[in-house]
Structure formats: C-alpha cells, structure tokens
C-alpha cells in the first residue's frame, strides 16, 4: 500500500485534533497580596514577569491549542514554583532577599524575561531605564544582614 502525502497530512490533522481533548490546567489561583512596590516598579514587573511568576497569568489564544498549551502550562507552573509574586508575603525575609538578588542577576544577565517569550510579548522587553528602575528598587528593598542559606 502506497502512503501518499495526503494520507500523512490527514493523519497528522486527525492526531492534532485528538490531542486537543487532553486537559490543561490554565487556572489562576487567587492573589493573596500584591508585592509592595511603587506603581512604576509594578508597571515594569507586570508585563515582564507576571505571566509566569504570578497568579495573574494572561493566557493567550494559543494556550488553548495542544501541544503548545502543554508547554505554556508547564512554563507557568515552573515559573510559579520558582517565584510567585502573588504569594510574596508567604516568603520569609531571607527568601525574599534571595529571590530579589537572583531575579536581579537574571535580569541583568538578560536571562529574564526569556528570549523565547519576547517575540510574542514585546511589551515584556526591558529597556535600560526599566532595568535601572528595577535595580534601584531591588537595592531599596533588600534587607541587610539576612543570610541567604534558606531555600
């Protein structure tokens, strides 16, 4: 039996249709309390960080389409596990210091927001001025003499 391009394409389309029935968690749990930051800092953090690092994720249309939906749900889950601005007050001062320092290092090194996020979310791109504002905010909220050993 000869497999034609049309049959392969039809099989692919059917498979793509079938995987849409696999459920994906795109929930946004309640926000416990906003991180204490100025409106200027919030205006930078929200578009650049909150889709992955808060319970205020704005799920784009393509988050409804498998297999992309699986990847997005996983990225958000991992981002919230690592740092969640919506549960900031649960963290001890030591942990907050650790997160602020690590976050700033990742921003300064260009690791956050991730390169693959920016093409579809250009509003998340951080300008020099944005990074300066975040750096000054980070310096102002770091608690002196807090040990970083806590995980």
Regions found by a protein language model. Name each.
Residues 70-120:
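Extracytoplasmic electron-transfer domains, predominantly the class I c-type cytochrome c fold
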Residues 110-111, 118, 122-148:
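C-terminal capping alpha-helices of c-type cytochrome domains
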Residues 6-23:
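Hydrophobic membrane-insertion alpha-helices, especially the h-region
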Residues 25-45:
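Electrostatic cytochrome c docking/interface patches
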Residues 45-57, 112, 134:
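The canonical Cys-X-X-Cys-His
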Residues 74-80, 144-151:
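Extracytoplasmic/periplasmic C-terminal soluble domains
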